[in-house]
Regions:
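Short beta-strand-to-loop acidic/aromatic patch adjacent to the donor-nucleotide binding site
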Residues: 4-16
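Generic beta-strand/beta-sheet core signal
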Residues: 10-11, 38-39, 121
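Basic/Trp-rich segment in TM-proximal cytosolic loops or flexible interdomain/linker regions
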Residues: 72-73, 131-168
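Catalytic donor-sugar/metal-binding loop of nucleotide-sugar-dependent glycosyltransferases
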Residues: 73, 108-126
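Acidic donor-binding loop at a coil-to-helix junction in glycosyltransferase catalytic cores
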Residues: 101-107
Length: 168
């Protein structure tokens, strides 16, 4: 792969995308971003207070973190699905080599450690969120384990980058 396509979009099988999703995220690609995240909205906002809390968190993440970082010229962060990566990056790595429980965080950290700036595009997609506290708790335990996998793999590289003043 990579010889036919300019970029890949990573989605979960049950994600839904807005009709203009690809054209909006492609604008960021055309602007030079080799990696770009987008706006995750909830498919089931009104199903429970848990799913509503997730949707509110994702709005905050998109508007006040990633959009603000984009406006300031600093790197954004990938979170879950709904993001694009240039085929040049995948080809340059000789394939996809991110297999932790939180490969999104792992790839974001890799980008930061290698001075690859992640952009943000307001391309909207919809993701189903947990409905119960128990389901949310189990998901967050998995995320925590994945975070530590990434930390122990990239912590030294990130500290070296901070010392050198490199911030993607």
């Amino acid at each position: 792969y990579g010889d036919t396509y300019e970029a890949f979009v990573v989605m979960d099988a049950d994600n839904l995308v807005a009709p203009n999703y690809l054209s909006v995220i492609n604008q960021a690609f055309d602007a030079g971003y080799l990696v770009c995240t987008s706006y995750r909205n909830s498919k089931n906002f009104d199903s429970s207070w848990i799913s509503s809390a997730y949707a509110t968190w994702f709005m905050r993440e998109a508007k006040f973190l990633n959009n603000a970082r984009m406006m300031m010229g600093t790197s954004c962060a990938i979170s879950g699905s709904g993001w694009m990566v240039s085929a040049r990056i995948v080809k340059g790595m000789h394939g996809w080599d991110f297999h932790t429980l939180t490969e999104d965080i792992q790839f974001s950290t890799f980008c930061c450690a290698h001075n690859i700036q992640i952009g943000y595009a307001p391309a909207e997609f919809f993701d189903e969120q947990p409905l119960t506290f128990k389901a949310s708790w189990i998901q967050r335990l998995r995320w925590t384990k994945g975070f530590y996998q990434v930390f122990f793999s990239y912590g030294t590289d990130l500290l070296k980058g901070i010392v050198k003043g490199q911030f993607a």
